[in-house]
Amino acid sequence: MRFVDEVVIKLQAGKGGNGCVSFRREKYVPRGGPDGGDGGNGGSIYLKADENVNTLIDYRYKREYYAENGRPGEGRNCYGKAGEDLYLVVPVGTSVFDIDTNKKIGEVLQHGQTFKLVSGGKRGIGNTHFKSSTNQAPRKFTLGEEGEYKEVRLELNLLADVALLGLPNAGKSTLIRSVSEATPKVADYPFTTMYPHLGVVKVGVDSFVMADIPGVIEGAAEGAGLGLRFLKHLTRARCVLHVVDICPFNESDPVENYFAVEKELEKYSQELFDKPRFLVINKIDLLADKVEQKCQEFVEQIGYQGKYYTISAAMKKGTDELAKKLNEFLQKQE
């Protein structure tokens, strides 16, 4: 299924039903009083989060949504039926922005959570309510109100505990495949990953969610490549893994590659740059010898002071230990 993480839709809540003008007319009550009922309220439109949905693609092809109108009131004090509410099912992590103001107006972050987008119009009042001591046969009633209209932008930011960051072909997709049941495409060419993937990593009785996004290239913060569009999916992650290919097939310099990604991350968002971040040195199986020494030299060259991990995602070497350490970190954060 195609991954869509941003759409614009138009919403029209239902109109309230009109109140009714009616008088009681029975065989032995020729001049009965007013008995016009109220109309029904118009239906509202809500977002509803569903953990089984992972894309906004349904809203790419249908852009306008209408809730049901309330029915008019009837005689014998019968109220009109309320318009049925409409629920738009979206992935967990979906935010809503008002198109007119470009301000965020809400979000749904938990399975089953709802958020009202537009409110249905209020019902009209029947003539029963207008009877008084001086007006025993009122013909006054009110119309139902129009439902609220709004144009909104839905944006999906994936909810993950750990996010993978790195250049194309750094081995991020192979890593997530090796520690979870996610199945992103893996190949030896840039941008094999065209959209984000989520994988559930199980460590004993615990588990956490890992996200793989398309690789970041130089200029991503200005829109180059695919990285800019998907960097936003890192914003809700609790920590970031910077995956570096220690032995690039294109013979590029791992040190330069490391700084290129770090630079783009900082330019994109200082908040994202300040998140807990760990270095993962991948593809150590391609180093002929002195693996530990070469990895240590790389770490010293980039001036990295934090915790780092050396792995071969393809050979599943060091990946279990990495998952275990990540789980320990996440448990301490709770």
Curated annotation (Swiss-Prot):
Pfam families: GTP1_OBG (PF01018), MMR_HSR1 (PF01926). Keywords: Cytoplasm, GTP-binding, Hydrolase, Magnesium, Metal-binding, Nucleotide-binding. Its cofactor is Mg(2+). Residues 1-159 form the Obg domain. It is found in: Cytoplasm. GO terms for molecular function: GTP binding; GTPase activity; magnesium ion binding. GO terms for cellular component: cytoplasm. Its EC number is 3.6.5.-. GO terms for biological process: ribosome biogenesis. The keyword Nucleotide-binding applies. Coiled coil: none annotated. It comes from the Bacteria. Residues 160-331 form the OBG-type G domain. GTP binds at residues 166-173, 191-195, 212-215, 282-285, 312-314. Mg(2+) binds at residues 173, 193. PANTHER family: DEVELOPMENTALLY REGULATED GTP-BINDING PROTEIN-RELATED (PTHR11702), MITOCHONDRIAL RIBOSOME-ASSOCIATED GTPASE 2 (PTHR11702:SF31). Belongs to the TRAFAC class OBG-HflX-like GTPase superfamily. OBG GTPase family. NCBIfam families: Obg_CgtA, PRK12297.1, PRK12299.1. An essential GTPase which binds GTP, GDP and possibly (p)ppGpp with moderate affinity, with high nucleotide exchange rates and a fairly low GTP hydrolysis rate. Plays a role in control of the cell cycle, stress response, ribosome biogenesis and in those bacteria that undergo differentiation, in morphogenesis control. Monomer. This is GTPase Obg. It comes from Francisella tularensis subsp. novicida (strain U112).
